[in-house]
Amino acid sequence: MKTTKFNIENLDLFYGENQALKSINLPIPTRQVTALIGPSGCGKSTLLRCLNRMNDLIEGVTITGKLTMDGQDVYGNIDVSDLRIRVGMVFQKPNPFPMSIYENVAYGLRAQGIKDKKHLDEVVERSLRGAALWDEVKDRLKSHAFGLSGGQQQRLCIARTIAMEPDVILMDEPTSALDPIATHKIEELMEDLKKNYTIVIVTHSMQQARRISDRTAFFLMGELVEHDDTQVIFSNPRDDRTRGYVNGDFG
């Protein structure tokens, strides 16, 4: 396995009295796609949100155990805003801001006080190219982002994320609201993005996990049942529960 970006050790998470994650131990490799799979409510999205401390925003959450990124304690004395720049997130439904295509991508930089137009122009173009969207929008950058198709909006959100130069991109079912053609474009994009970023994706699609991920982790009722190379998980899993899930015996 490649070098480890995240290392998760004995992680427990509670929503009040309800335990959502149970003693999770999982290494996440650098510059690969790691897919988190399992039935609804199994804890995969909860774990994803631990990686950039989005769960901090939920009242009553308690987390124990250890989670490090490049050896640094994610739940230690760190700047959470900086963490969420380094660990960007793309959500299930495209969520462009109510502004132009250009300003969507430039938004984070402007929020950091960057005003130099040449620099902004360069980052916007580079980010849109990185999200495989530049050729489709380069002649209408001042147009409202809501005029884009759903698939284009999701790639715009990816461009907005990579404009901040993160180390990691988290994706929470990023294609579930998209048609097959748009889904295919996002999947192709992930293959290219992993050359520069560590990607962790939650998906309900077994076919998608098999197509796009290098590693797969299977969750069930808050437990990590097993994790391995994706080919192993789908062809020769160690646990009968994993075999049953990937074969469609339950969902």
Swiss-Prot record:
Q: Which residues form the signal peptide?
A: none
Keywords on record: ATP-binding, Cell inner membrane, Cell membrane, Membrane, Nucleotide-binding, Phosphate transport, Translocase, Transport
Question: Which EC number(s) are documented for this chain?
Answer: 7.3.2.1
**Any single GO BP term:** phosphate ion transmembrane transport
- Family designation: Belongs to the ABC transporter superfamily. Phosphate importer (TC 3.A.1.7) family.
Purpose: Part of the ABC transporter complex PstSACB involved in phosphate import. Responsible for energy coupling to the transport system.
Q: What is this protein called?
A: Phosphate import ATP-binding protein PstB 2
Q: Which organism is it from?
A: Vibrio cholerae serotype O1 (strain ATCC 39315 / El Tor Inaba N16961)
